[in-house]
């Protein structure tokens, strides 16, 4: 990935994403960056490295001593979205059928959730479910379901970072 000066688009720092995959520990020479989002908690980018399954927390406060924290998630990371508090970043590992959850305040993974076939790599949607409280929902490419994941570890700890419902044809 490249960190650039915003107004001029001048490259300031180029960082390789080459590395080992999280599951088989095979070397991948050209993994792609699938998403880059800005943290609401720290001067930090959250970078999804697709083929390796690693999420990089890139502290850009000192480019001369760049600090990168590596979190192991699941291969085939794609895009994702924030919970309603903008603390937790939920991101799809679409061909691994998982959703990874990053706590951007504490800078760690808090969940790697098994979901139904091919979660859609999108931003998702946040709303308050009448039974499960705050949830984040995402569709799928491999089926017609919308998966709901509980996102309130303080108020609804028993549902946090779990699939609480799947909405599909049976609910229509």
Regions found by a protein language model. Name each.
Residues 1-171:
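Predominantly soluble domains enriched in secretory-pathway, periplasmic, or organellar proteins
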């Amino acid at each position: 990935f490249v960190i650039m000066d915003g107004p001029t688009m001048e490259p300031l720092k180029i960082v390789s994403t080459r590395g080992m995959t999280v599951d088989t520990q095979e070397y991948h020479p050209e993994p792609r960056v699938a998403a880059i989002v800005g943290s609401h908690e720290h001067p930090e980018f959250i970078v999804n490295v697709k083929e390796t399954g690693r999420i990089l927390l890139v502290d850009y406060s000192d480019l001369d001593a760049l600090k990168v924290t590596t979190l192991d998630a699941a291969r085939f990371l794609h895009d994702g979205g924030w919970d309603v508090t903008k603390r937790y970043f939920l991101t799809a590992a679409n061909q691994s059928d998982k959703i990874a959850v990053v706590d951007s305040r504490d800078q760690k993974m808090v969940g790697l959730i098994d979901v139904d076939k091919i979660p859609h790599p999108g931003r998702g949607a946040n709303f308050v479910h009448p039974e499960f409280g705050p949830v984040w929902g995402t569709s799928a490419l491999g089926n017609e379901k919308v998966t709901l994941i509980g996102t309130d570890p303080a108020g609804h700890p028993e549902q946090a970072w779990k699939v609480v419902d799947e909405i599909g044809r049976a609910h229509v």
